[in-house]
């Protein structure tokens, strides 16, 4: 272990230019490249790299309309959010408004179903 500690100390004392030269020497000695694999893939064959669409993992549930039965919707909003009666009423009356933000897809679908069962209209975004 003392040898490893000495190597770490020696490497830590290198300048940037010395570290770059060491990197080149190790690449030649071991026959490897420090280049990023993405750069190698983009250079090969002239193929256009496809943009990978990131799958959305967090969703917002938006109350778009309270509907005719606002009392049931207010009760459901209170149950979902844990808000007090006044805060839930204000949220329902201010529609369109986010009821819950940054939730999983399954939870967002469940909340939307509960709101719609109470008579409201909701969207998941």
Curated annotation (Swiss-Prot):
Q: Which domain of life is it from?
A: Bacteria
Provide a GO biological process annotation: translation
**From the UniProt record, which GO molecular function terms apply?**
mRNA binding; structural constituent of ribosome
Q: Name one GO cellular component term.
A: cytosolic large ribosomal subunit
Which Pfam families would you find in this protein's record?
Ribosomal_L12, Ribosomal_L12_N
**SUPFAM superfamilies assigned:** ClpS-like (SSF54736), Ribosomal protein L7/12, oligomerisation (N-terminal) domain (SSF48300)
Going by the UniProt record, its keywords in alphabetical order are: Ribonucleoprotein, Ribosomal protein
Q: Which InterPro entries match?
A: Ribosomal_bL12 (IPR000206), Ribosomal_bL12_C (IPR013823), Ribosomal_bL12_C/ClpS-like (IPR014719), Ribosomal_bL12_oligo (IPR008932), Ribosomal_bL12_oligo_N_sf (IPR036235)
Family of this protein: Belongs to the bacterial ribosomal protein bL12 family.
The record describes its quaternary structure and partners as: Homodimer. Part of the ribosomal stalk of the 50S ribosomal subunit. Forms a multimeric L10(L12)X complex, where L10 forms an elongated spine to which 2 to 4 L12 dimers bind in a sequential fashion. Binds GTP-bound translation factors.
Q: What does this protein do?
A: Forms part of the ribosomal stalk which helps the ribosome interact with GTP-bound translation factors. Is thus essential for accurate translation.
The name this protein goes by in its record? Large ribosomal subunit protein bL12
Report the source organism. Answer: Rhizobium rhizogenes (strain K84 / ATCC BAA-868) (Agrobacterium radiobacter)
């Amino acid at each position: 272990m003392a040898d490893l500690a000495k190597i770490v100390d020696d490497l830590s004392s290198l300048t940037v230019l010395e570290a770059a030269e060491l990197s080149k020497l190790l690449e030649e000695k071991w026959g490897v490249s420090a280049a990023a694999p993405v750069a190698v893939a983009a250079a090969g064959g002239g193929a256009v790299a496809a943009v990978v669409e990131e799958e959305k993992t967090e969703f917002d549930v938006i109350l778009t309309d309270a509907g005719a039965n606002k009392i049931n919707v207010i009760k459901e909003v209170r149950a979902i959010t844990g808000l007090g009666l006044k805060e839930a009423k204000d949220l329902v009356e201010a529609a369109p408004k986010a009821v819950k933000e940054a939730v999983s897809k399954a939870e967002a679908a469940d909340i939307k179903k509960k709101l719609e069962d109470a008579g409201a209209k909701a969207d998941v975004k």
